[in-house]
Amino acid sequence: METKPYLIALDLDGTLLKDDKTISENTLHTIQRLKDDGHYVCISTGRPYRSSSMYYQQMELTTPIVNFNGAFVHHPQDDSWGRYHTSLPLDVVKQLVDISESYNVHNVLAEVIDDVYFHYHDEHLIDAFNMNTTNVTVGDLRENLGEDVTSVLIHAKEEDVPAIRSYLSDVHAEVIDHRRWAAPWHVIEIIKSGMNKAVGLQKISDYYGVPRERIIAFGDEDNDLEMLEFAGCGVAMGNGIDAVKQIANRTTATNEEDGVARFLKEYFSL
């Protein structure tokens, strides 16, 4: 058994979670054994905290968490740890709304940590994003937003996504980073330039004094690339995109096949 503690970073969707958005009993049991052995387990996700807290609680974690792909990092159980919030300037957000309107997009959402602003009313999106328990404001973002935001989501027509992303790269490359969500959502997610999961993971590893060679990170999508590269052992899911598998040190089974648990059991001889 390993005696020095490892830091194990888990993406949620397509990685830790099965397709039905649950954690298998096998995976829960494996994570508990690693925690009992003194290892640190953390979540590193593109989701906001409000839609990842249930998994944090289910796994009974006691570590900081990375949300919004690194734009928000905090410790849910220790306010003194600090809150690292890297936001998008409000003037840039207003420009993003302008360009979105010119493409007649379905909607634009702005998130300020756990408050959500919709440019247009959209019951379907509110339900899909599980926002019924969230502070939701509907109306022109240029009027309703009074502070810098954590992230912007542009829900566009599929055929317009490449053109909008090209514009973002041409005009705002120094200020923002943008990614396209996996199907079926034709959503462009925008955060402050330079933010990624590795930035958040480094804050956590520094806090615990765990060197990179004792960090294991799991992921499946392009927002996991930097984190897998940062970790001493980056593990791609079997269902991951090719770019993730190419950059990873190892590839495990799919999220439906308990890929996380299978790798960890083998690695730590559980």
Swiss-Prot record:
Its cofactor is Mg(2+). CDD domains: HAD_Pase. One of its GO terms (cellular component) is cytosol. GO terms for biological process: riboflavin biosynthetic process. Phosphate binds at residues 12, 45-46, 197, 223. InterPro entries: Cof, HAD-like_sf, HAD-SF_hydro_IIB, HAD_sf. Pfam families: Hydrolase_3. The keyword Metal-binding applies. Its EC number is 3.1.3.104. It comes from the Bacteria. The keyword Metal-binding applies. Mg(2+) binds at residues 11, 13, 220. Catalyzes the dephosphorylation of the riboflavin precursor 5-amino-6-(5-phospho-D-ribitylamino)uracil and of flavin mononucleotide (FMN) in vitro. Belongs to the HAD-like hydrolase superfamily. Cof family. This is 5-amino-6-(5-phospho-D-ribitylamino)uracil phosphatase YitU. It comes from Bacillus subtilis (strain 168).
